[in-house]
Amino acid sequence: GMSFPLSVGASSLLFNGRPTPDSVSHILETYQPTVYYGVPTLFAALLHKWETDGAAPQVPLRCCTSAGEALPAEIGRKWRDLMGIDIIDGVGSTEMLHIFLSNRPGDVQYGTSGTAVPGYEVRLVDEDGAEVSTGVVGELLVRGGSAAADYWNQRDKTRRTFEGEWTRTGDKYERTAAGRFIYCGRTDDMFKVSGIWVSPFEIEQ
């Protein structure tokens, strides 16, 4: 992420302190960035701070991107109402070195992770590796040119994660009729109730 701004002649703001709501709010107000990347937890914390303070800083943001965990729809809507700009929620991984599933500027649907980014393919499979139908929860697999080859000196993990050109993300998703993907949880934290996958994440929401 640090090299992307440089590739288009932009500047990056580096902060070596702890990213608290106070410190990040100060940076936004002081340096007036036009693009802001954060995790949902920090977006929520900033909203809480500004609501408590009674005002948000005036920042010329033209793009806000969230990753690292699923963005709760309520946080996205509150941010848009307060700041006048959507949060572009996306999904990436260390293994893929890039965001491969994302909403788009002007085409944001909160509560979903959007659609596949150009250059990447995604599919959902069941426990036997068969593709699942629309509306059925399955594990997300992705392939694209940025994928890692393996885990250094971790043969067993490599075999579990990389299947030919496809990388298993460990994330459970549901695909809508419109082709958007809804996050349902991790494969290692979901459980079945009467044959149906249940996600702690969905229950919490």
Language-model-derived ranges and their functions:
Residues G1-T34, K49:
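Conserved AMP-binding/adenylation subdomain of ANL enzymes
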Residues T41-F43, L71, A147:
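Alpha-helix capping/helix-boundary segments
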Residues R123-L141, R175-A178:
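Conserved beta-loop-beta connector loops within the AMP-binding
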Residues G111-A116, E131, T161-G164:
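Short Gly/Pro-enriched turn/cap motifs at secondary-structure boundaries
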Residues G68, G92, G114, G129, ...:
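Active-site glycine-centered loops adjacent to acidic/histidine catalytic or metal-binding residues
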Residues S7-A10, P33-G38, H48-Q109, E121:
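Gly/Ser/Thr-rich phosphate-binding loop
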Residues E29, Y36, G144, A149-D150, ...:
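AMP-binding/adenylate-forming catalytic core of the ANL superfamily
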